[in-house]
């Protein structure tokens, strides 16, 4: 048996006909149209999201979890294996320093308002210099093993902010 495009159709019973409600008592769905008697749910346009008729709603029965860390960093994650693929495909230049802008242009670093974090998944064979916001120990070791280097931003020493300055000024004033 050959199948022709102009003879394709659904199996019998695959599409059930729509029930037309409110069309007389003989239809079985007349008068109240399956909505029961009076009340809020018998009226039109009423559907209260999350309301379960006085029963404690599901979204309130389940415990709250987690929090939003206001100090959390948003890094774009890039693996060494992906960088090597891009170098092999000539989408990245191994001789130039690879930074957030270069990785974004290559289509790897999406988002990451705090920069790029380099991870060690995959293998890197090219000698590359990275200028990134963060890198795992394994990634740094893998890059250095391949003959490259990872330039990370200088970390500020503890107590180098406004509060420490004010404390130092107050101590000098009292002395």
UniProtKB/Swiss-Prot annotation:
Residues 23-37 have a biased composition (Gly residues). Keywords: Ribonucleoprotein, Ribosomal protein, RNA-binding, rRNA-binding. GO terms for biological process: translation. Residues 1-13 have a biased composition (Basic and acidic residues). Gene3D superfamilies: 3.100.10.10. Pfam families: Ribosomal_L27A (PF00828). This is Large ribosomal subunit protein uL15. It comes from Sphingopyxis alaskensis (strain DSM 13593 / LMG 18877 / RB2256) (Sphingomonas alaskensis). The gene is rplO.
């Amino acid at each position: 048996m050959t199948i022709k495009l102009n003879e394709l159709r659904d199996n019998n019973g695959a599409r059930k006909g729509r029930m037309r409600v409110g069309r007389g008592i003989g239809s079985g769905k007349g008068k109240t149209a399956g909505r029961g008697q009076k009340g809020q749910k018998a009226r039109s346009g009423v559907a209260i999201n999350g309301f379960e008729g006085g029963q404690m709603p599901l979204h309130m029965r389940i415990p709250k979890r987690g929090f939003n860390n206001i100090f959390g960093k948003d890094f774009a994650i890039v693996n060494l294996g992906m960088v090597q693929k891009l170098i092999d495909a000539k989408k990245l230049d191994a001789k130039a320093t690879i930074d957030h802008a270069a990785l974004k242009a290559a289509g790897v670093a999406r988002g990451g308002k705090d920069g790029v974090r380099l991870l060690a998944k995959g293998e890197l064979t090219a000698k590359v210099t990275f200028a990134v916001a963060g890198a795992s120990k394994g990634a740094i070791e893998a890059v250095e093993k391949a003959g490259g280097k990872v330039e990370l931003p200088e970390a500020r020493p503890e107590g180098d902010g406004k509060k420490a300055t004010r404390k130092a000024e107050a101590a000098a004033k009292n002395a």
